[in-house]
Amino acid sequence: MLALRCGPRLLGLLSGPRSAPLLLSATRTCSDGGARGANSSSGNPLVYLDVGADGQPLGRVVLELKADVVPKTAENFRALCTGEKGFGYKGSTFHRVIPAFMCQAGDFTNHNGTGGRSIYGSRFPDENFTLKHVGPGVLSMANAGPNTNGSQFFICTIKTDWLDGKHVVFGHVKEGMDVVKKIESFGSKSGKTSKKIVITDCGQLS
């Protein structure tokens, strides 16, 4: 069971095969959207997630992946967006959304927080903790403890510096933070969403 500590409360979040604990300790092709190798001005890949809620489109989130800092983690996410390995994020859900904290997704096998896999196998090690959870829009890996990264990820909606050194930050929202806020609006303190929030399409931008 994935344990997410919010202040004195412990919120259960399921992640990983065998319901391994995904620890978010808190104190308070998918289709290809264009040519391969699309980059931001920094030379890092840009990917997109098109998101809908109960069948209604919410919009597009564009993410810059920090391949210059965490290349292996960034490549995992990029390939899961394009679906080039035969599996990926398209059709999966934001299964856990906690307002004033984060929006979690990436379980494309079980769709409830108990599954997912990386392009390197079931799990891969923490690459580094160079990047920090500095504020809204930070893109970070969910995990079940040290060196258990798979496909689940979360987008922060506040600064979450208590997660530094525990979760690998590998990107940030470049465009579409308004869409992230819409996703957040369907969340709850327990993490259960009031609508089914689906990644309807995803890929790499040209």
From Swiss-Prot:
Single biological process term from Gene Ontology: cellular response to hydrogen peroxide
Record entry for activity regulation: Binds cyclosporin A (CsA). Is displaced by CsA from the mPTP leading to a lower open probability of the mPTP.
Description of the deletion phenotype: Mice are developmentally normal and show no apparent anomalies. Mitochondria do not undergo cyclosporin A-sensitive mitochondrial permeability transtition. Cells show resistance to necrotic cell death induced by reactive oxygen species and Ca(2+) overload, and animals show a high level of resistance to ischaemia/reperfusion-induced cardiac injury. Mice show a dramatic reduction in brain infarct size after acute middle cerebral artery occlusion and reperfusion.
Recorded superkingdom: Eukaryota
EC id: 5.2.1.8
The organelle targeting sequence, given as a residue range: 1-29
GO cellular component, one term: mitochondrion
Modified residues (N6-acetyllysine): 66, 166
Classification via PANTHER family: PEPTIDYL-PROLYL CIS-TRANS ISOMERASE (PTHR11071), PEPTIDYL-PROLYL CIS-TRANS ISOMERASE F, MITOCHONDRIAL (PTHR11071:SF408)
Protein name from the UniProt record: Peptidyl-prolyl cis-trans isomerase F, mitochondrial
